């Protein structure tokens, strides 16, 4: 009787080796099948590589003061927008405000920022690459790159348009050399 129970146990309860091998054998067909990723669908995922970004001179400033690249939407069209702004050393915006919040991420370099209607480049605060700045709607501020800097700053700016830029003092230029 002992022999018979032993043989039934073997049939009902497989050895430990079989328990360990079962999941591996079940997964084997998955590992052997070779699948290639589908080609990217530009209607679903749009990619712009760095060498494809179209930079244009900032119309409100002198040549080589700042450049802008629109990646999505537009500053004067209703809806979301994403732009890149590049400030060169020595140039800053005059105090101004926007009708909507702006969310800004420093991508490279150091951005110098401050709030208020007075323009004092020495009172600006440095925001290095990786830093985040939220510009609250209808609040005056100014920013750019101090002339002592050795490289430009590139900022990714996200928000809702139209931005409706308003200078604190429209009788003065929209930029300053600082």
Region annotations inferred by a language model:
Residues 1-15, 22-30:
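N-terminal secretory signal peptides
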Residues 128, 138-163:
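Ligand-binding loop in jelly-roll beta-barrel domains
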Residues 81-97:
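Conserved short histidine dyad/triad with adjacent acidic residue
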Residues 36-79, 169-178:
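A short, N-terminal "cap"/entry segment at the start of jelly-roll beta-barrel domains
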Residues 119-137:
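Short acidic-glycine-tyrosine-enriched beta hairpin
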Residues 93-95, 113-114, 135, 140-147:
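Short beta-strand His + acidic residue motifs that chelate non-heme Fe in jelly-roll/DSBH
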Residues 88-89, 98-118:
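Glycine- and acidic-residue-biased ligand/ion/polar-headgroup-sensing regions
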């Amino acid at each position: 009787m002992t022999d018979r129970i032993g043989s039934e146990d073997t049939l009902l309860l497989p050895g430990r080796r079989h328990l360990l091998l079962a999941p591996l054998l079940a997964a084997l067909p998955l590992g052997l099948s070779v699948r290639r990723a589908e080609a990217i669908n530009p209607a679903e995922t749009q990619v712009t590589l760095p060498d494809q970004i179209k930079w244009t001179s900032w119309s409100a400033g002198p040549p080589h003061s700042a450049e802008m690249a629109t990646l999505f939407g537009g500053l004067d069209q209703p809806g979301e927008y994403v732009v890149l702004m590049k400030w060169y050393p020595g140039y800053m915006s005059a105090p101004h405000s926007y009708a909507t919040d702006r969310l800004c991420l420093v991508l490279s370099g150091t951005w110098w920022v401050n709030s208020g209607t007075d323009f004092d480049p020495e009172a600006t605060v440095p925001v290095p690459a990786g830093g985040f700045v939220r510009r609250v709607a209808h609040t005056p501020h100014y920013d750019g790159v101090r002339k002592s800097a050795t490289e430009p700053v590139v900022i990714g700016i996200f928000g809702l348009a139209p931005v409706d830029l308003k200078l604190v003092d429209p009788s003065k230029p929209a930029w300053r050399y600082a």
